[in-house]
Swiss-Prot record:
Enzyme class of the recorded protein, top EC level: lyase
Free-text comment on the cofactor: Binds 1 Mg(2+) ion per subunit.
Stated role: RuBisCO catalyzes two reactions: the carboxylation of D-ribulose 1,5-bisphosphate, the primary event in carbon dioxide fixation, as well as the oxidative fragmentation of the pentose substrate in the photorespiration process. Both reactions occur simultaneously and in competition at the same active site.
Post-translational note: The disulfide bond which can form in the large chain dimeric partners within the hexadecamer appears to be associated with oxidative stress and protein turnover.
SUPFAM superfamilies: RuBisCo, C-terminal domain, RuBisCO, large subunit, small (N-terminal) domain
Record's protein name: Ribulose bisphosphate carboxylase large chain
Active site: 165, 284
Chain positions recorded as Mg(2+) binding sites: 191, 193-194
Amino acid sequence: VGFKAGVKDYKLTYYTPDYETKDTDILAAFRVTPQPGVPPEEAGAAVAAESSTGTWTTVWTDGLTSLDRYKGRCYHIEPVAGEENQFIAYVAYPLDLFEEGSVTNMFTSIVGNVFGFKALRALRLEDLRIPPAYVKTFQGPPHGIQVERDKLNKYGRPLLGCTIKPKLGLSAKNYGRAVYECLRGGLDFTKDDENVNSQPFMRWRDRFLFCAEALYKAQAETGEIKGHYLNATAGTCEEMIKRAVFARELGVPIVMHDYLTGGFTANTSLAHYCRDNGLLLHIHRAMHAVIDRQKNHGIHFRVLAKALRMSGGDHIHSGTVVGKLEGEREITLGFVDLLRDDFIEKDRSRGIYFTQDWVSLPGVLPVASGGIHVWHMPALTEIFGDDSVLQFGGGTLGHPWGNAPGAVANRVALEACVQARNEGRDLAREGNEIIREASKWSPELAAACEVWKEIKFEFEAMDTL
């Protein structure tokens, strides 16, 4: 027959330490924890094999293709500092293994069956280098940062948002009322909670109508362009597009999608619809912590963020560094840059394993949301800079005088921080002082400062290098 049947070590075929990576290869950095007795080279090679062309035994049909052309290769392995039995395995995948413009297909290969592999105790995808040749097959974000600013006519400051709470249980009319109060008070955006879809207490069409009414009323009063993220996420792609179409017919500026629970295929379809029809697209990352929170297994959020930029979204939630949800500062800033910038240098101190060139794919605005309030404003302004959306749910609606004064307090705090920064003051050191000064002439801000002066969410971050 002319082929050698039987099982042979993966490392004989898939571990190639002298391989020179190509500009068109997709490169992956995996954190591998092998089972006791499995050498790291074999574990790394097994990952490369099982996520590309390999299977557990030699097969006759191997002779009908060119393994050299199509196989994934583990080209470098390094131990993880401070961990006994963990290694970073670098794998290069030939471009031809992937369907153009499909995040779904890319993930099915790279993070598919290989994560259940018995020879590994745990496996985590830490980073991906997407080559320009592959980036160019994606539309990416429907509009991007600059186009969004032009649509909204807002420059030189972060944008302000608020998630409407209680997240479930309000009727459509009361929901619209809450939206109106927040927007009238000075916020740029309000947001459907990620789990608001179309439930018995509030069907989607009613919510869309009342929110649109609130939006137009607030715009007329304030003379500013306003938005409400209408969550189009649904049980089927057809229903999702139907909701997006209705949003477009109402003339609203932005819709929203839960990209992990909704899935990459649905998300990419919606992103294409949004670009074709002039809608901005806000992305919520519900379910991300299931995938990214374990340090030794899963997928790091920076990879999910890159995947979203390819699939398409104009905003994505990315942690706060200071609020109630997970996020270590340098690492968060690393993937915030991956979302916004066109070219990002490799920087291991921020968890960035590869240089990434997005070749003019539009950028995504990071959204800081979760347990933040007016006292955090100086830190948020400093950490995230102008190109971001700062979202205060409880930090707006929890104001003792109601939603509109809560919105006023946040807007005053933000404008004070931006002004102080532009005057050259140090927000990190003088932040509290800046907020106190501003609260002297804003009773709304003074009341907010009083309510939240003692609140802290301080735990050790899990997401360390």
